[in-house]
Regions:
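A domain-start/cap signature at the N-terminus of enzymes
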Residues: 1-46
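Short glycine-enriched nucleophile-adjacent loop
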Residues: 65, 155-166
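A conserved short beta-strand
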Residues: 75, 167-179
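The feature captures the conserved acid-bearing segment of alpha/beta-hydrolase catalytic domains
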Residues: 176, 180-262
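Histidine-bearing beta->alpha loop at or near hydrolase active sites
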Residues: 263-269
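Catalytic active-site module of serine/aspartate enzymes centered on a nucleophile-bearing elbow/loop
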Residues: 275-285
Length: 285
């Protein structure tokens, strides 16, 4: 798609590096940027940033982009990914998308060689301080209408941004967020925000999408043996069933324009692609 474009949208690619202070290394990222072919409105285009940009872009059809180009407010779509050809870079996203927590809060599944967590604050600063300004230099963007989409761990990141730096975006779209991660740590961030500064999120827009089909059945493989899978399911029990819906209701009561939609019959993994048309259409209204 990024090579061919679609009627109504053209693509360009931006490259980025950022310094990871924890490891004293440079990390590379890229954004496949889909820009409406229509003239930009005076205030600039809305901008929607997608985490796991490689995976998200693989799920977007030319027909969907053409439909979007004809909407009331066609957005610029920024597919942000680690600079490789992996659909999902599991280790890189685990670090970039998760908040810093005490290691004791991590499940056995999460505590595995080569996987680190806790880089979300630095990654959010990278997005707001470097990625968005570079996009704005490339095409006119409306700073009052920016959005962030993320799935699973990416959903944690979206909520972390809302709960800790709500002015980063106007529209937040977490898809099947892994609320169980870190023994429900993200819910403690929500609690702190609502207790200390609920006015900070008043009038923000939140669209939460979840699946109803649960986890697709998995066979043990490689490092995901039966014991590891058991740890996964145990970790998910750290957050009561229905907590996502209750979180949405709490945020709605605090003044957030919050809604939740269930994608019927879809497993956690299937919600990634299925959520995109719904989110795009809501954002472009």
């Amino acid at each position: 798609m990024a090579d061919t474009g679609a009627p109504g949208y053209r693509f360009t690619r931006l490259q980025f590096t950022r310094h990871d202070a924890k490891h004293d290394t440079q990390k590379a990222y890229r954004v496949n940027l889909a820009i409406p072919e229509t003239p930009a409105p005076e205030e600039g285009f809305p901008l929607l940033i997608m985490l796991d940009g490689n995976a998200a872009l693989m799920e977007v059809s030319a027909d969907l982009l053409t439909e979007l180009s004809q909407s009331a407010a066609p957005p610029v779509l920024a597919f942000l990914a680690h600079d490789n050809d992996l659909r999902i870079d599991g280790d890189a996203r685990a670090y970039d998308y998760t908040p810093a927590v005490n290691e004791s809060a991590l499940s056995a599944k999460e505590q595995r060689p080569g996987r680190e967590y806790g880089g979300a604050d630095g990654y959010l600063s990278f997005i707001t301080g470097k990625v968005i300004p570079a996009i704005s230099d490339n095409t006119p963007v409306n700073p009052e209408k920016t959005g962030l989409w993320g799935h699973s761990y990416g959903g944690i990141f979206v909520l972390h941004a809302l709960f800790t730096r709500p002015d980063s975006f106007a529209f937040y779209a977490p898809v099947d967020p892994s609320l169980w991660w870190g023994e429900g740590y993200i819910l403690s961030e929500e609690h702190d925000l609502l207790a200390e500064s609920p006015a900070d999120i008043k009038d923000k827009s939140l669209l939460v999408l979840t699946g109803s089909g649960g986890e697709a059945k998995r066979r043990p493989r490689g490092d995901r043996d039966a014991a590891t899978l058991a740890a996964v399911y145990k970790a998910r029990e750290s957050v009561p069933a229905g907590e996502t819906a209750r979180m949405v209701e709490r945020l709605k009561a605090a003044g957030v324009d919050a809604q939740m939609t269930t994608l019927q019959g879809l497993s956690h993994g299937e919600t990634l692609g299925a959520s995109l048309p719904y989110v795009f259409r809501q954002f472009a209204r």
